[in-house]
Amino acid sequence: MLASACLLTCLGQIAQKYAVQGWRGAFPGVFAALRSLWLALACLGSGLLIWLLVLQRLDVGIAYPMLGVNFVLITLAGRYVFNEPVDVRHWLGIALILVGVFQLGRQA
């Protein structure tokens, strides 16, 4: 369930990015942006509901830091979906997040 909450939250963030990119273009782009915005709201809302279920089952001290995976997924999406630059320091930070999530996952 935690993975579902993370994935839906990340999909919502990616849809938000698509939505704001659509606002820059011509009128048909606005309609696509609105579609992306509704998709973002649906993903984020669903992710929130699943997150609430996760909090019923896991300690918040374990569950919340696991959301660090979102930083990893969003960085990968930024790099490979939106062609955004990611420098070495950012990758090192991502590696540290993954080590922390792995350590917490061993406790859960």
Curated annotation (Swiss-Prot):
GO molecular function: carbohydrate derivative transmembrane transporter activity
Pathway(s) the chain acts in: Bacterial outer membrane biogenesis; lipopolysaccharide biosynthesis
Biological function: Translocates 4-amino-4-deoxy-L-arabinose-phosphoundecaprenol (alpha-L-Ara4N-phosphoundecaprenol) from the cytoplasmic to the periplasmic side of the inner membrane.
Main location: membrane
Protein family per UniProt: Belongs to the ArnE family.
GO cellular component, one term: plasma membrane
Membrane-protein topology: Multi-pass membrane protein
Description of how the protein assembles with itself and partners: Heterodimer of ArnE and ArnF.
Highest taxon in the source lineage: Bacteria
A Pfam family annotated for this UniProt entry: EamA
Alphabetical list of PANTHER family matching this protein: 4-AMINO-4-DEOXY-L-ARABINOSE-PHOSPHOUNDECAPRENOL FLIPPASE SUBUNIT ARNE-RELATED, SMR FAMILY PROTON-DEPENDENT DRUG EFFLUX TRANSPORTER SUGE
HAMAP family: Flippase_ArnE (MF_01869)
Calcium as UniProt keyword: no
Parts of the chain that traverse the membrane: 36-56, 58-78, 85-105
InterPro entries hit by this protein: EamA_dom (IPR000620), Flippase_ArnE (IPR022883), Small_drug/metabolite_transptr (IPR000390)
Alphabetical UniProt keywords: Cell inner membrane, Cell membrane, Lipid A biosynthesis, Lipid biosynthesis, Lipid metabolism, Lipopolysaccharide biosynthesis, Membrane, Transmembrane, Transmembrane helix, Transport
Identification of the protein by name: Probable 4-amino-4-deoxy-L-arabinose-phosphoundecaprenol flippase subunit ArnE
GO biological process, one term: lipid A biosynthetic process
Subcellular location: Cell inner membrane
